[in-house]
């Protein structure tokens, strides 16, 4: 089959972790001669532009996000709202459906990549466009929670059922704690935008796709992908690790100067992504745990619920006690550049798939502190299956961590003489070497492009 350049439209969920993940794949596809139309709102475009390494092949197409009652003015992505308001962002995204149809009719792409817009496959089919579900979450999570064997158990699934993986799941060691299973069970009854149940939205998006794609490699997630393929009776492909090319900008001076004042590998960096807003007690235990380590730390976290700024949420006397070695910042940061900084030796991560992919190719050690959803199962895979990080201990019933448990996990990974640390470091080094193998990545992207050609040609 003779290959030809494809025209691919992209419309990811309006969260920066999803947006950047899609764009990083675009960069890999553009190198191979494919044309990309990346549909995104203006605020997201401004943040994404430095990461567009092929502007002649990747074009941003502006979509205006309509206002929905309850959202702040000009809210365009989840970064503009607190976690409880994310369903309204989803509703706003659903309201762009007619505009998306108009855009796709004019653009005439061969394929459209999507994730949360469950209406996209039907729309694409009507326009003669192939629909690719590109999942930024791990196949570990999808296999555990969203496959037909689990989905058809319905909304009355018990917590005890969810504490164990579904029948046929490839890894019996990956399980949920009581508080996590309770949250997952409740989530099955939650709507997420436009009065659509969250799990209905995700299941339809997966079940009606022409192709299911995951940002991973089979060496890490192969058994989970095979399980999903059998469950949905659909082709499931890996795009490869999609290693991030360095952004075209330098690290902001305030961060590079601050980090430059410490020894190599000595700084603890903590970031929970653009979507996570901690409860006040979680925020307090986190920052007090960082203080307790006695190590220099940079924490990029949003102000907790009920607070306007991170400064106003600090415990009394905290800033004075950590002056010179502690930096708590409430805004968006250039995480990829921070993780690559030689002073950073540890990364406390919420285990979002994007953050993990950035972390695994760097040398910093991983402390796993998941918050919601797929992050929890990502943490189990990283901590229990791959053993490349140490998860912060939480109460089984309440899911609460303490300053001591935060400090303990950091202290373990930062102590190169600790037996757990030695094992984690060795496993991380092995995975890092695998992911940084350019031949591996290139072969995956080439194979993925060939699969896209076959889907378009109907093979």
Swiss-Prot record:
Note: Flavonol glycosides (FGs) having glucose at the 2''-position of glucose or galactose that is bound to the 3-position of kaempferol are present in cv. Nezumisaya and absent in cv. Harosoy, whereas FGs having glucose at the 6''-position of glucose or galactose that is bound to the 3-position of kaempferol are present in cv. Harosoy and absent in cv. Nezumisaya.
Reaction equations catalysed: a flavonol 3-O-beta-D-glucoside + UDP-alpha-D-glucose = a flavonol 3-O-beta-D-glucosyl-(1->2)-beta-D-glucoside + UDP + H(+)
Top-level taxon of the source organism: Eukaryota
Keyword field: Glycosyltransferase, Transferase
EC nos: 2.4.1.239
Residue numbers annotated as active site: 18 (proton acceptor), 115 (charge relay)
Binding site for an anthocyanidin: 18, 373
Gene3D superfamilies: Glycogen Phosphorylase B
MF annotations from Gene Ontology: flavonol-3-O-glucoside glucosyltransferase activity; UDP-glucosyltransferase activity
A Pfam family assignment: UDPGT
Binding residues for UDP-alpha-D-glucose: 136, 333, 335, 350, 355, 358, 374-375
Tissue: Expressed in leaves.
Family: Belongs to the UDP-glycosyltransferase family.
Transferase listed as a keyword: yes
Function as written in the Swiss-Prot or TrEMBL entry: Flavonol 3-O-glucoside/galactoside (1->2) glucosyltransferase converting kaempferol 3-O-glucoside to kaempferol 3-O-sophoroside. Has a broad in vitro activity for kaempferol/ quercetin 3-O-glucoside/galactoside derivatives, but cannot glucosylate kaempferol 3-O-rhamnosyl-(1->4)-[rhamnosyl-(1->6)- glucoside] and 3-O-rhamnosyl-(1->4)-[glucosyl-(1->6)-glucoside]. Has a higher preference for UDP-glucose than UDP-galactose, and no activity with UDP-arabinose and UDP-glucuronic acid. Represents probably a recessive allele of the gene.
Protein's name in the database: UDP-glycosyltransferase 79B30
Keyword match Glycosyltransferase: yes
């Amino acid at each position: 089959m003779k290959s030809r350049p494809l025209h691919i439209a992209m419309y990811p969920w309006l969260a920066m972790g999803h947006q950047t993940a899609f764009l990083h794949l675009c960069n890999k596809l553009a190198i191979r001669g494919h044309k990309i139309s990346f549909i995104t709102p203006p605020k997201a475009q401004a943040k994404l532009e430095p990461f567009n390494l092929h502007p002649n092949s990747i074009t941003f197409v502006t979509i205006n996000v309509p206002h929905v009652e309850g959202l702040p003015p000009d809210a365009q992505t989840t970064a503009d709202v607190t976690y409880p308001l994310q369903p309204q962002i989803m509703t706003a995204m659903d309201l762009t459906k007619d505009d998306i149809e108009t855009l796709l009719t004019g653009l005439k792409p061969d394929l459209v990549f999507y994730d949360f817009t469950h209406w996209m496959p039907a729309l694409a089919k009507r326009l003669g466009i192939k629909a690719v579900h590109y999942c930024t979450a791990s196949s570990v999570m999808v296999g555990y929670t969203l496959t037909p064997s689990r989905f058809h158990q319905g909304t009355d699934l018990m917590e005890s059922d969810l504490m164990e993986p579904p029948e046929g799941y490839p890894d019996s060691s990956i399980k949920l704690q009581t508080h996590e299973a309770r949250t997952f069970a409740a989530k099955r009854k939650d709507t997420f935008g436009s009065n659509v149940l969250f799990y209905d939205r995700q299941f339809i998006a997966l079940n009606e796709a022409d192709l299911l794609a995951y940002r991973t490699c089979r060496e890490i997630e192969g058994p989970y992908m095979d399980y999903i393929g059998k469950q949905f009776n659909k082709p499931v492909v890996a795009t490869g690790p999609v290693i991030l090319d360095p952004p075209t900008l330098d690290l902001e001076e305030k961060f590079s100067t601050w980090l430059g004042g410490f020894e190599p590998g000595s700084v603890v960096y903590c970031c929970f992504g653009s979507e996570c807003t901690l409860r006040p007690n979680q925020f307090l235990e986190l920052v007090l745990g960082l203080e307790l380590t006695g190590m220099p730390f940079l924490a990029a976290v949003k102000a907790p619920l009920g607070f306007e700024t991170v400064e106003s949420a600090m415990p009394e006397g905290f800033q004075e006690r950590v002056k010179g070695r502690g930096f708590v910042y409430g805004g968006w940061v250039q995480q990829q550049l921070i993780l690559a900084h030689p002073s950073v030796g540890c990364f406390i991560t919420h285990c979002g798939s994007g953050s993990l992919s950035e972390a695994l190719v760097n040398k910093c050690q991983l402390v796993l502190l998941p918050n919601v959803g797929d992050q929890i199962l990502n943490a189990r895979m990283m901590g229990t299956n791959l053993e490349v990080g140490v998860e912060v201990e939480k109460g089984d019933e309440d899911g609460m961590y303490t300053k001591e448990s935060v400090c303990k996990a950091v202290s373990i990974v930062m102590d190169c003489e600790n037996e757990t640390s030695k094992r984690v470091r060795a496993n991380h080094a092995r995975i890092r070497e695998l992911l940084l193998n350019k031949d591996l990545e290139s072969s995956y992207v080439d194979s993925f492009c060939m699969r896209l050609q076959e889907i378009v040609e109907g093979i």
